Amino acid sequence: MDFPCLWLGLLLPLVAALDFNYHRQEGMEAFLKTVAQNYSSVTHLHSIGKSVKGRNLWVLVVGRFPKEHRIGIPEFKYVANMHGDETVGRELLLHLIDYLVTSDGKDPEITNLINSTRIHIMPSMNPDGFEAVKKPDCYYSIGRENYNQYDLNRNFPDAFEYNNVSRQPETVAVMKWLKTETFVLSANLHGGALVASYPFDNGVQATGALYSRSLTPDDDVFQYLAHTYASRNPNMKKGDECKNKMNFPNGVTNGYSWYPLQGGMQDYNYIWAQCFEITLELSCCKYPREEKLPSFWNNNKASLIEYIKQVHLGVKGQVFDQNGNPLPNVIVEVQDRKHICPYRTNKYGEYYLLLLPGSYIINVTVPGHDPHITKVIIPEKSQNFSALKKDILLPFQGQLDSIPVSNPSCPMIPLYRNLPDHSAATKPSLFLFLVSLLHIFFK
C-alpha cells in the first residue's frame, strides 16, 4: 500500500476547488451533486420544479438538519439568476455553497450559522434564460426572460394592481416552494446596478406613492437589512460606482423610489409568504467577464454571510393552549405594524418576527376570540445566533378544533387597492421612521 498517497488523499478537500468560471447547467448540476454526496450530513439537494425547457430548478439546503424543518431553527433563502443574463449572483451562490460546506467545523462563525439556520440556496431560477445567452453583454442580452419570453420578476401576483399575465412554470414552482417552508428572510440576486433595494416595488397613495416611495409597515427593519448588506460591500456602499446610472446614497434604495414595477418577487414574498426579501443588484454590468468573478466574490463574501445572520433578529417562539398543544394558524402581529395579509403560526404553532432592538406589544389572535396581548423587549444583540425566544400560552382548554391546520391564503388580488390612506397596514409611524434612522446612523 502506498501510505504517502493515502495520507495525501485524506488531506485533500472533499470537493475540488470551485473555479471562477461561468458554470452552465451541466457543470452547475455536477457541482451541486458532488457537494450533496460528499457533505450529505449538512446538505440536501432537491429540485423544486422544472423550467419551460425541462431544466431542473435546483435548491441546495445547508444546515445541521438539512432535510426537514426543526422547531426553532429559522429558514433562510437566496435566489439568483432570475434574469438569465444577470449572472454574477449565480456564481456567487455556488461559491457561497463551497465556502459554507468547507468551513463547517473549521470556522466557528460558519459552524454556528449552520447549527442554527437552515439555508436554502437556488443558484438559478431561470436556467433556460442563462443557456440562451449567446453573446454576453453589460446591458441587455437575449436570455433576460424565460423561454416563453416572460420577465419572471413581473410574473407574480401583485398586491397593488391586477397582474393578468400567464403564470410561468418557474414562477409557479417558486410559489409552491414558498408554501412548503416557513421562510423568514430572503434575498434575490440581480445585476445591472449596484444597490440593495427593499420593498415595496409597487405602491399606492396609502403606502407613500405620492412622495415617490412605497413603504411597508416594517420599513425600519427593511432599511436595516439593506444597509447590513450594502455597508459591507466596499463598492456598493459608495452608491455611485456605476457610470451613467442613478446614484444611491449608501448603496440603498426603496424599490418604488428607484422605479415602480408590477408583479415582483420581493413584494410577493413579504405579503403572501410571510418572508422578508430584498433585491441585491451586484454588478454594474449584467454579464461581466469571467476574470472579474474573484473580485465580486471578495466584495460580497462578508455581506452574504452577515445577511444570513439577520434571520436571527427579533423574536420567535410557539403559541400553545393550556394543555401544551401547539396552535397553528394563529395571527401573531406587532402592534402598529399590521400586515395587510396577517402573519400566522405554522403547523407547529411557530412564529418568527424580524424586529430591531426595542420594546414591542404583540397581539396574538385566535379566529373568533379576543386578542391576547404580550410585551417583549428585544435585546441589543442576538444570543448565540438566536432571536429572543418567547413562547406564548393562551388561556384555552384543549385543542381548538375551529383552527385549521394550514394557513388560509389571503386572496391573490390587489389587497392595497381600496385601503384607506390612514390604514395601519400601510403607514409606518413617525416613531418607526425615527428608530430606523437611529439604527442606520448609530449602529
From Swiss-Prot:
Membrane topology qualifier: Lipid-anchor; GPI-anchor
Domain of life: Eukaryota
Impact upon substituting residue 277 to Q: 2-fold decrease in substrate affinity. Small increase in specific affinity. Reduced heat stability by 50%
UniProt xrefs under SMART domains: Zn_pept
Family matches, as CDD domains: M14_CPM (cd03866), Peptidase_M14NE-CP-C_like (cd11308)
Subcellular location: Cell membrane
Disulfide bonds: 138-285, 242-284, 341-410
Catalytic activity: Cleavage of C-terminal arginine or lysine residues from polypeptides
GO cellular component: cell surface; extracellular exosome; extracellular region; extracellular space; plasma membrane; side of membrane
PROSITE patterns referenced in this protein's UniProt entry, alphabetically: CARBOXYPEPT_ZN_1 (PS00132), CARBOXYPEPT_ZN_2 (PS00133), PEPTIDASE_M14 (PS52035)
Residues that span the membrane, as ranges: none
Active site: 281 (proton donor/acceptor)
Activation/inhibition comment: Inhibited by O-phenanthroline and MGTA and activated by cobalt.
Keyword line: Carboxypeptidase, Cell membrane, Disulfide bond, Glycoprotein, GPI-anchor, Hydrolase, Lipoprotein, Membrane, Metal-binding, Metalloprotease, Protease, Signal, Zinc
Signal peptide (UniProt feature, chain positions): 1-17
Record organism: Homo sapiens
Name of protein: Carboxypeptidase M
Physiological role: Specifically removes C-terminal basic residues (Arg or Lys) from peptides and proteins. It is believed to play important roles in the control of peptide hormone and growth factor activity at the cell surface, and in the membrane-localized degradation of extracellular proteins.
Lipoprotein listed as a keyword: yes
UniProt cofactor note: Binds 1 zinc ion per subunit.
Peptidase M14 domain boundaries: 21-311
